[in-house]
Amino acid sequence: MTSILQVALLALIFVSFALVVGVPVVFATPNGWTDNKGAVFSGLSLWLLLVFVVGILNSFVV
């Protein structure tokens, strides 16, 4: 169970880093928001899902 938590946490860290770098780039490019709105919302949905998964898995490990 601990290794599953570690993998989920690592995925959360990678998605967070990608969003921290990617979202400002999307807003800085011309027509970036209209062209990449779906990708940003998909990334945010994945991030929110991973936050809940890590929280639930953490309750089983601790």
Swiss-Prot record:
Q: Gene3D superfamilies recorded for this chain?
A: Photosystem II PsbZ, reaction centre
Q: Return the InterPro entries for the record.
A: PSII_PsbZ (IPR002644), PSII_PsbZ_sf (IPR036512)
The knockout outcome noted for this protein's gene is: Not essential, grows like wild-type at 25 and 17 degrees Celsius and from 20-200 umol photons/m(2)/s. Loss of PSII-light harvesting supercomplexes. Loss of PSII-light harvesting supercomplexes without a decrease of major antenna proteins, at 17 degrees Celsius and 100 umol photons/m(2)/s loss of minor antenna chlorophyll a-b binding proteins CP26 (Lhcb5), decreased levels of CP29 (Lhcb4), less extreme pheotype at 25 degrees Celsius and the same light. Altered phosphorylation state of PSII and LHCII, impaired non-photochemical energy quenching.
**Keyword list, A-Z:** Chloroplast, Membrane, Photosynthesis, Photosystem II, Plastid, Reaction center, Thylakoid, Transmembrane, Transmembrane helix
Show the stretches that span the lipid bilayer: 8-28, 41-61
Q: Name one GO biological process term.
A: photosystem II stabilization
Gene induction:
Transcribed as a monocistronic and dicistronic transcript (with downstream psbM).
Its Gene Ontology cellular component terms are: chloroplast thylakoid membrane; photosystem II reaction center
Entry membrane topology: Multi-pass membrane protein
Q: Where in the cell is it found?
A: Plastid, Chloroplast thylakoid membrane
SUPFAM superfamilies reported for this sequence: PsbZ-like
Pfam families, alphabetized: Ycf9 (PF01737)
State the family it belongs to: Belongs to the PsbZ family.
- By its UniProt entry, which NCBIfam families does this protein fall under? PS_II_psbZ
This molecule's function is given as: Controls the interaction of photosystem II (PSII) cores with the light-harvesting antenna, aiding in the dissipation of excitation energy within PSII. PSII is a light-driven water plastoquinone oxidoreductase, using light energy to abstract electrons from H(2)O, generating a proton gradient subsequently used for ATP formation.
Its assembly, as annotated, is:
PSII is composed of 1 copy each of membrane proteins PsbA, PsbB, PsbC, PsbD, PsbE, PsbF, PsbH, PsbI, PsbJ, PsbK, PsbL, PsbM, PsbT, PsbY, PsbZ, Psb30/Ycf12, at least 3 peripheral proteins of the oxygen-evolving complex and a large number of cofactors. It forms dimeric complexes.
Q: What is this protein called?
A: Photosystem II reaction center protein Z
Which gene produces this protein? psbZ
